[in-house]
Amino acid sequence: MASEKLKAAIIGSGNIGTDLMIKIMRHSEHLEMAAMVGIDAASDGLARAARLGVATTHEGVEGLTRLPVFDDIDFVFDATSAGAHVKNDAFLRALKPGIRLIDLTPAAIGPYCVPVVNLDAHLDSRNVNMVTCGGQATIPMVAAVSRVAKVHYAEIVASISSKSAGPGTRANIDEFTETTSKAIEAVGGAAKGKAIIVLNPAEPPVMMRDTVYVLSDLADRAQVEASIEAMAAAVHAYVPGYRLKQKVQFDEIAADVPLNIPGLGRFSGLKTSVFIEVEGAAHYLPAYAGNLDIMTSAALATAERMAQSLVQA
């Protein structure tokens, strides 16, 4: 007998929302795609949803509540913008207090969630924030070092193809850096975090690449490397295109020639450099859009576990 599936809606019919819809319909064990919500009647995402037999509305979150299927919806994925999510959460919560929102914007009303690091702690949350694409790719690496040694500082540089960044991503650049930096600390375990995003205009488009620099107490390098490799394998389980681009690199910062970290002061210890590449599954945009893929894959992995927990309960 097939397991019960819970109904889900997606707000935001752009690149992220459309990719997520395809993932749910092809791969979800516990969720059923029930509605696609947008604000542009001519958007490709709404057109695709309609062709696939999914209920659609171009009247935003208000339109969603007017759809006959709304009463049966348990999960809503929000792939709009940080500002819009705050309003969407309040509007939906007033009508259905128990509804689960998976926030794919940098709004961060609810706790940050990076599935491989802290999902178990948030299975009962009504609103979880998926940080950012850069956060989903890099925070696991910071956490991997954190479980071996105290991390004083972590800096990530996320480089994504300009073609993969839609208007929503571009409008949220400031929020991207702020939210990712905070989550590096809150989830990754760093005392201080910093995030940088680069939109690469290269043609042909390049795959998502991320660089992670971690400054920690001195530790056994083999243990740190093993922790990083194990964490990368865990992410790969739900993001098949996720991989370490090259071997982990280590540098020892001697006490007599310390680094000066703004806002942190002088540092000596172990510098760990991790280089990641994320190839997209090409469900909607081509394979270069790994940033899209890791965000939607993480969101789906989170909702799947939550739905499984609800069904079993």
From Swiss-Prot:
Disulfide bonds: none annotated. SUPFAM superfamilies: Glyceraldehyde-3-phosphate dehydrogenase-like, C-terminal domain, NAD(P)-binding Rossmann-fold domains. NCBIfam families: ac_ald_DH_ac, PRK08300.1. GO terms for biological process: catabolic process. The active site is at 133 (acyl-thioester intermediate). NAD(+) binds at residues 13-16, 164-172, 291. Its EC number is 1.2.1.10. Gene3D superfamilies: Dihydrodipicolinate Reductase, domain 2, NAD(P)-binding Rossmann-like Domain. It comes from the Bacteria. SMART domains: Semialdhyde_dh. It catalyses: acetaldehyde + NAD(+) + CoA = acetyl-CoA + NADH + H(+). This is Acetaldehyde dehydrogenase 3. GO terms for molecular function: acetaldehyde dehydrogenase (acetylating) activity; NAD binding. Belongs to the acetaldehyde dehydrogenase family.
